[in-house]
Curated annotation (Swiss-Prot):
PROSITE patterns: RIBOSOMAL_L29 (PS00579). This is Large ribosomal subunit protein uL29. It holds the Pfam family Ribosomal_L29. Keywords: Ribonucleoprotein, Ribosomal protein. InterPro entries: Ribosomal_uL29, Ribosomal_uL29_CS, Ribosomal_uL29_sf. The gene is rpl29. It comes from Methanothermobacter thermautotrophicus (strain ATCC 29096 / DSM 1053 / JCM 10044 / NBRC 100330 / Delta H) (Methanobacterium thermoautotrophicum).
Length: 64
């Protein structure tokens, strides 16, 4: 999944934001479960970007 920037997120409406948030949380959960099973993080940079994107989406949702 491509990382979303603030400008792209601000162009979305509420329904799109909620859908994107659900997708990001599901993707993050998959990374967490993989790393728990393997004992090592597959791609820590990607996990960090997903967390930050989730935070961006939540921040913009709260602004609206």
């Amino acid at each position: 999944m491509a990382i979303l920037r603030s400008e792209e997120i601000r162009e979305m409406d509420g329904e799109e934001l909620q859908k994107k948030l659900d997708e990001l949380k599901a993707e993050y959960a998959r990374y967490i479960s993989k790393s728990a099973a393997a004992g090592i993080h597959e791609n820590p940079g990607k996990m960090r970007e997903i967390r930050r994107t989730i935070a961006r989406v939540l921040t913009i949702m709260n602004e609206k």
